[in-house]
Amino acid sequence: MDEPPFSEAALEQALGEPCDLDAALLTDIEDMLQLINNQDSDFPGLFDPPYAGSGAGGTDPASPDTSSPGSLSPPPATLSSSLEAFLSGPQAAPSPLSPPQPAPTPLKMYPSMPAFSPGPGIKEESVPLSILQTPTPQPLPGALLPQSFPAPAPPQFSSTPVLGYPSPPGGFSTGSPPGNTQQPLPGLPLASPPGVPPVSLHTQVQSVVPQQLLTVTAAPTAAPVTTTVTSQIQQVPVLLQPHFIKADSLLLTAMKTDGATVKAAGLSPLVSGTTVQTGPLPTLVSGGTILATVPLVVDAEKLPINRLAAGSKAPASAQSRGEKRTAHNAIEKRYRSSINDKIIELKDLVVGTEAKLNKSAVLRKAIDYIRFLQHSNQKLKQENLSLRTAVHKSKSLKDLVSACGSGGNTDVLMEGVKTEVEDTLTPPPSDAGSPFQSSPLSLGSRGSGSGGSGSDSEPDSPVFEDSKAKPEQRPSLHSRGMLDRSRLALCTLVFLCLSCNPLASLLGARGLPSPSDTTSVYHSPGRNVLGTESRDGPGWAQWLLPPVVWLLNGLLVLVSLVLLFVYGEPVTRPHSGPAVYFWRHRKQADLDLARGDFAQAAQQLWLALRALGRPLPTSHLDLACSLLWNLIRHLLQRLWVGRWLAGRAGGLQQDCALRVDASASARDAALVYHKLHQLHTMGKHTGGHLTATNLALSALNLAECAGDAVSVATLAEIYVAAALRVKTSLPRALHFLTRFFLSSARQACLAQSGSVPPAMQWLCHPVGHRFFVDGDWSVLSTPWESLYSLAGNPVDPLAQVTQLFREHLLERALNCVTQPNPSPGSADGDKEFSDALGYLQLLNSCSDAAGAPAYSFSISSSMATTTGVDPVAKWWASLTAVVIHWLRRDEEAAERLCPLVEHLPRVLQESERPLPRAALHSFKAARALLGCAKAESGPASLTICEKASGYLQDSLATTPASSSIDKAVQLFLCDLLLVVRTSLWRQQQPPAPAPAAQGTSSRPQASALELRGFQRDLSSLRRLAQSFRPAMRRVFLHEATARLMAGASPTRTHQLLDRSLRRRAGPGGKGGAVAELEPRPTRREHAEALLLASCYLPPGFLSAPGQRVGMLAEAARTLEKLGDRRLLHDCQQMLMRLGGGTTVTSS
């Protein structure tokens, strides 16, 4: 089989393929290639004399000198010395060569005969030597070096086989015709001189697993002699062509037939136990062809190629090979350790130190992160490029910030940037007629019609990937909308056209005949005669002109309304650039609201409105224009014209998707306006009353235009916020608009859902409506901290108004009990307790629908959908209801509410004010004496009363300038404690009736402990009456009771009771002052005074004998109307006692 030419390219190609050799084998191959390439310096004087011949020719193989027989086995010394001399000769200078000729056909290679029997473990390899012949001697130029060799004693070749190796038939030729020279193979670095047939040495190694044959360029280098062949051969220059064989072992052989020695360099492996048999080399010379077999030892392990060294340095070479492998292993270990450390460091940078990933996953994550950084860097470069281009346009800093901050103009700006960048970075064509070619510096290719890259292999520039990948995100022309100044200017123009009516003037001026038409003048040489006026004027124009003018005016108004409401409204399509900016700022506003950063939340909401194409006014002119436009728009929407046109915002075509997007855009803008209005009302957003009014009207108009996209609760809340703004910002003369907006909210709820949201049901109640419209209250910027209700959402003003209304209900209920209507003939006198229970029931419903403390700060949520329970207000309502039920002697209803009052809410427990604890202990004392569980009567109830009295005194001492509701609660608790102590004293009275003949001294007095406690509570009541005048009525009654308990003089007691029995008014102008200093007693106080006077005063203080029974009967009738069954029961018991002793008294 023909062998390919031997070159370095073939070697590199073979080395590039996968193999089982390790890095040491590749290193040795590179070292050997370096030795081969540097053959000039390694073997100086190879072709110097005395080996150089005449230079023109050599010994002809066909001459008689070369055909004489001779011995084939010269002495070994001669052969060895001849080979050394041949290898040490210098290289001759190259001579000009002729052009190359066609390559000769080499002779076939035949295996050797099996006469040689190698030992075990040794394989036999045949090395046939074939002489390549060519007809004409034409060497290659620059590739072959002519050599000349000396002609020693010519040995004779024998045609008979040597050493039992028969000559294969027709296989070898040993000579060439006279005068012919041989041409070496092209590509060989070393060639025979002209006239000398080159001999190629073919080595074939058989192995168990066939490997790829590696061939390298051979240099005349030889290892120490391992095999010596003694033969008597002819002096024939032999082309040494050793072959590197990639197999289980590697062999490099070189032979030279110079009549002296033949050297075979075998590269033995470093593996211990590898032996090479050094015996006589079986050689067959037949017709000038040398066939040699070399026994080799093939090892199954990997065998590195050793450096060529002398035979005497074999131990040192083996030692260096071991040191080299050790060093190589250390290098590999350091290399792998460095790789592992860098991979671990890369993992820590990309995914963190806690993650557990393999090397492949770490590299994959790193690649993804690098791509993300590249994409981010590209976006930043694009933004930087856009900013630089905007700066080059000589824009001011304000315009630049506004252009970059507005989401709607970002894409338009980038389009202009892209065009300018392409024009800047793309050089012009060389001439006008040449086609446009994309420059390598250009960011995008315009040569392609599709806008892609100029070539198929080059991708588009990543600067404009976003604009190419998402072309649908560019905002359309109608989505930008009109500014409020433009809207107001258009409205002003329409108003001027309708008021001045320029169309009528214009058409009327054209319709009237001109003077040249009415009067004609005839010129003649003599006289000028005036023509007569034409009386046949166009009468039809007078009737047709007004309808045409009004038709044109109506068309102008219609076109203006369409421009304002249909094509002037900004519509933000989903997944567009402005929509992305809007939701980004809105989500950030939600986060800022949750953190309590209200100023930053207001800034984010402002940017969100800019993204929607609805920027807030920044100057006074813009604010005035925006406010006037919103007023005009609200009036038009009340006429249903504006609302019908706004429902078709974006276009008059029947596009359902566009209408849905327009409604959603209006809803989002309305919610943002509403939240900004709430922040402004709570003092979290800067601006005056005009700014707040503008925000309220904008939210209301857009919410009405959104239609079904806005929930009923949200729409009602926006109406209530507008009513709140009217009451807060507008003068009192315009407060009637509050009723209008509240009515609109109620109608909106009832028309769509049929029910009012729970958080706004109190607005539909007459009491709540009256409180909202006529109440004297104001919204504070800080949450209202109170003991009687919890604060709601701090950014919702309606939650604060609801909290104020709950406290108002509690105060009204307390006033019904402690200070009812003083008019004796009032129709409401018998409804004091029922009115109080009605207020408390409304308070409970408001407490159940109040905003929970864990409110939601989302812009889309509202108090209308977020409900909770106010436990504090509910506890106070339950306490007041329990006391009222005890006074009405409705013990079953009181017991149902007692479990709610027994446990004080956590907020009141953590409070430092003693008033809640005083209320709790007062309830416990009243329950022990007035309730069903009367087992704790006596000393235990007195102990509870003492605790309650102590907390009440602390409350009066710590809060001298308390609010009206605090004073009402303190009066309620103080009166309750005095009633409990009075009931305890009455229970200790004997059951016998009080005869009229007995004096007060005969009645049992209260103990010192009871009197001391009663005086303590009475002093608290006097202290409260100094700042709260309605408490003075109770002071007179309880002071008379204290004198009765102590058995004091009845004269002073009668005077105190007389203040409650007689209703005196001041004379004339002093009546108001007297009424202010001494409040008129209520009907309950009058009945209580009658009961005390008839029961405990001596008979001498009564005017008639039957007056006691009459007083008791009158007191019973009054208490029955009031519904105080407790005192009514005591009065009836006294009447029964007096009925048995009437005869004694009258007699």
Swiss-Prot record:
Keywords: Activator, Cholesterol metabolism, Cytoplasmic vesicle, Disease variant, DNA-binding, Endoplasmic reticulum, Golgi apparatus, Ichthyosis, Lipid metabolism, Membrane, Nucleus, Phosphoprotein, Steroid metabolism, Sterol metabolism, Transcription, Transcription regulation, Transmembrane, Transmembrane helix, Ubl conjugation. One of its GO terms (biological process) is regulation of transcription by RNA polymerase II. A motif (9aaTAD) lies at residues 27-35. Activation by cleavage is down-regulated upon activation of SIRT3-dependent PRKAA1/AMPK-alpha signaling cascade which leads to inhibition of ATP-consuming lipogenesis to restore cellular energy balance. Changing residue 483 to A: No effect on proteolytic processing. The modification Phosphoserine is found at residues 98, 117, 337-338, 396, 402, 457, 1060. Residues 373-394 are annotated as: Leucine-zipper. Changing residue 527 to C: In IFAP2 and HMD; loss of sterol-regulated protein processing; loss of localization to the nucleus; decreased DNA-binding transcription factor activity RNA polymerase II-specific. Residues 1-60 are annotated as: Transcriptional activation (acidic). Residues 465-479 have a biased composition (Basic and acidic residues). The 9aaTAD motif is a transactivation domain present in a large number of yeast and animal transcription factors. It is linked to IFAP syndrome 2: An autosomal dominant form of IFAP syndrome, a disease characterized by a peculiar triad of follicular ichthyosis, total or subtotal atrichia, and photophobia of varying degree. IFAP2 patients manifest ichthyosis follicularis or follicular hyperkeratosis, hyperkeratotic plaques, sparse to no body hair, and photophobia with punctate corneal epithelial defects, corneal pannus, and complicated cataract. Ultrastructural hair analysis shows trichorrhexis nodosa. This is Sterol regulatory element-binding protein 1. It comes from Homo sapiens.
